[in-house]
Amino acid sequence: MNAAVMTSPTNFSDYVIADLSLSAWGDKEIRIAETEMPGLMAIREEFAAAQPLKGARITGSIHMTIQTAVLIQTLEALGAKVRWASCNIYSTQDHAAAAIAAAGTPVFAVKGETLDDYWEYTHRIFEWPNDDKGAPVYSNMILDDGGDATLLLHLGTRAEKDASVLNNPGSEEEICLFNSIKKHLAVDATWYSKRLPQILGVTEETTTGVHRLYQMHKEGKLAFPAINVNDSVTKSKFDNLYGCRESLVDGIKRATDVMIAGKVAVIAGYGDVGKGSAQAMRALSAQVWVTEIDPICALQAAMEGYRVVTMEYAAEHGDIFVTCTGNYHVITHEHMKKMKDQAIVCNIGHFDNEIEVAALKQYTWENIKPQVDHIIFPDGKRIILLAEGRLVNLGCGTGHPSYVMSSSFANQTIAQIELYANTKNYPVGVYTLPKHLDEKVARLQLKKLNAQLTTLTTEQANYIGVQQTGPYKPEHYRY
């Protein structure tokens, strides 16, 4: 596998990062991560000569971590040009951003950036230098995580026609987003509508962003095709489950040093993220309770031996609370008023509004260390809020391990190649990658683990009605 060569272009300044001097550290960690990312590195090696992304100008909005740096270098090795920002104000690893900037890639990401900065950086990843003849250059692909880059172009284009769509922000984040759009429209009244039609498609990483895409398409608002990377089996059943199983506890431990054994850990939501989170807590001998709205998921939790309760009941009994739903106000102000002194509250879903953090602003906040706060209630009770309700594994830790991110990012790279090279095959809509590509990613990942795959005989393949080389399961199969 060929590692990317890092070069330092002279007079390059198209970036906003914390500290360029961290680049050597970042580069060393990138080299280590490459050895743990067999799927992604194999894709890089397979397609490097063909340059399938030559001409692609990718706007990337995804956590600026060491693993993402390997993804960026892979996209570039396949011919793409990229501009990058983080999709979360706390998830950037500053040494990773420094390494990417030092290599000459435009990156706009600082751990702990403000929301105003966040939306400014999201605009910056759509702003390319003019070409040699002075003509404007625009992004033609988006690689998104949570859907913010996609949202920005769509909402901004609507605001050009009807400014009233920016009149009623529902959160602090929307206030910053709307103000940022107004600021750019004041300078260029067609900033968004010039860029939106240039986009050939988007590949979306996470559950929350995929939900947004399906909703936009249902409402007739989606302007370009999208590939739902999240629902590739080698993404959702691995990144979401096994990634969270390792990174959740890492984030909580780094933030609090709490002893988990014996504690009541309340896991809100029992999808793939919730399943991994519950397994992690049980592995450290917590008493795991689960809250769920879906009777099927609730039954799964019960059959695994978890106690299924409501949040109303759990609030006054739990020691550690983790939201994993992708929904809104799963832990409310009223729930937190009932909690024990020193209860730990955190989120591992994409957005911070799973916890009603805005309602806590009325109380005294005592910062313990970065991304760890005591919220002091009028009666003197304190709860510990991690990462201000944003992703605890990335805000307080370093996120998922490289190996599991290799599966996700191999899928992202394949999806970018497919959508860029075969745009005409994809009218506006939301698509998933075919199963044979899912199986390909799994095969590439297995090599690192020295696994031995059994090969079907011709008779066996004929008996179950599949090809010897797969795919082995029908599209409707639930892994």
UniProtKB/Swiss-Prot annotation:
Q: Which reaction(s) does the protein catalyse, per the Swiss-Prot or TrEMBL entry? A: S-adenosyl-L-homocysteine + H2O = L-homocysteine + adenosine
Q: Which family does it belong to?
A: Belongs to the adenosylhomocysteinase family.
Q: Which GO terms describe its cellular component?
A: cytosol
Where, if anywhere, are coiled coils annotated?
Answer: none
Q: Which GO terms describe its biological process?
A: L-homocysteine biosynthetic process; one-carbon metabolic process; S-adenosylmethionine cycle
Q: In which pathway does it act?
A: Amino-acid biosynthesis; L-homocysteine biosynthesis; L-homocysteine from S-adenosyl-L-homocysteine: step 1/1
Residues reported to bind NAD(+): 206-208, 240, 269-274, 292, 327, 348-350, 393
Cofactor(s) listed in the protein's UniProt record: NAD(+)
- Record's keyword annotation contains NAD: yes
Subcellular location, in the record's words? Cytoplasm
Which function does this protein serve? May play a key role in the regulation of the intracellular concentration of adenosylhomocysteine.
SUPFAM superfamilies assigned to the protein according to its UniProt record, in alphabetical order: Formate/glycerate dehydrogenase catalytic domain-like (SSF52283), NAD(P)-binding Rossmann-fold domains (SSF51735)
Question: Is the Disulfide bond keyword given for this protein?
Answer: no
Q: Which UniProt keywords apply?
A: Cytoplasm, Hydrolase, NAD, One-carbon metabolism
* Amino-acid positions noted as binding substrate in the UniProt annotation, renumbered to this chain: 65, 145, 205, 235, 239
Principal subcellular localisation of the protein: cytoplasm
Free-text remark on how the cofactor is bound: Binds 1 NAD(+) per subunit.
SMART domains this protein is in?
A: AdoHcyase, AdoHcyase_NAD
- Protein name as catalogued: Adenosylhomocysteinase
EC category name:
hydrolase
Name the gene for this chain. ahcY
The protein's Enzyme Commission number: 3.13.2.1
Citing just one GO molecular function, the answer is: adenosylhomocysteinase activity
Q: Which residues cross the membrane?
A: none
